[in-house]
Regions:
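Short low-complexity, flexible loop/linker segments enriched in glycine and/or proline
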Residues: 1, 87-91, 131-133, 151-153, ...
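Generic structural signal for well-ordered, non-membrane alpha-helical segments
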Residues: 2, 6, 19, 42, ...
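Rossmann-like dinucleotide/flavin-binding elements
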Residues: 43-74, 116-131, 139-148, 164-222
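Short, conserved active-site loop motifs that form the nucleotide-linked donor/cofactor pocket
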Residues: 101, 113-115, 160-162
Length: 231
């Protein structure tokens, strides 16, 4: 738990070097190529930091602030920390992603000046009561829904056939191993959409991708792209 394990995303390392010759970076370790000199720094006066959102970005921000001496409060409205990374790791081929939020949660647990509120809404009254000098918004984002008639009204509807990625993940254990004869349409051919394809295609479903861009897999690192497109 003390080690920040590689999650095999290939984005900052292989993605930056192969074909584009950019400096190596790391998705989960901002200190790569930058050093960890900040850890030697300490705030010179009392400073309260409020971080809203307990995903990986919020946890990293909260841990870093606490490590340099700030009194830090992290507010998460859900029962669990880790955000989207923890959710995506429920997909079998993405289970290594859980190593990152688990590392951050363990790191946070050792910081006595980091106070974590779970199952808590970040209301104006609560935030003001913590007397913050700095507020960090790490609440994440919502998926972009295309302008398809009826989509907004029917997505994630109980008993319906239209599911968001979050809802699909929450019910991932309910999908049978053999989906022969079933048709799955994935709207969006980016990284997340291709993750969905990788889940359903081996189960023998008839999978189609609908993507507004002229290519699928836009922005995916070259290593993952080769592996996905040869599936």
């Amino acid at each position: 738990k003390e080690i920040r394990k590689c999650i095999s995303c290939n984005i900052g390392c292989a993605g930056n070097r192969i074909g584009v010759n950019r400096p190596i970076r790391c998705t989960i370790n901002p200190a790569v190529n930058e050093g960890e000199g900040y850890k030697k720094l300490r705030v010179k006066k009392s400073c309260n930091i409020v971080v809203i959102g307990g995903g990986t970005a919020g946890l990293e921000a909260a841990c870093t602030a606490a490590e340099v001496g700030c009194t830090t409060f992290l507010i998460e409205k859900k029962a669990n920390l880790g955000g989207l990374a923890a959710e995506i790791s429920k997909i079998p081929d993405k289970k290594r992603l859980s190593d990152f939020p688990n590392y951050l949660i363990h790191r946070a647990s050792k910081l006595k000046n980091l106070f974590i509120f779970k199952n808590t809404e970040a209301t104006i009254e609560l935030v003001e009561s913590l007397n913050p000098n700095i507020i960090v918004n790490a609440t994440g984002s919502n998926p972009l829904l295309p302008p398809i008639k009826g989509l907004h009204e029917n997505i994630d509807k109980e008993g319906g056939k239209v599911s968001s990625i979050t809802n699909m993940i929450n019910h991932i254990t309910e999908y049978p191993e053999d989906l022969t004869g079933k048709k799955v349409v994935v709207i969006g051919g980016g990284a997340v959409g291709l993750d969905v394809v990788e889940f359903f295609a081996p189960r023998h479903a008839d999978v189609s991708i609908v993507e507004m861009m002229p290519v699928i897999g836009n922005g995916i690192d070259p290593v993952s792209k080769v592996g996905t497109f040869t599936m």
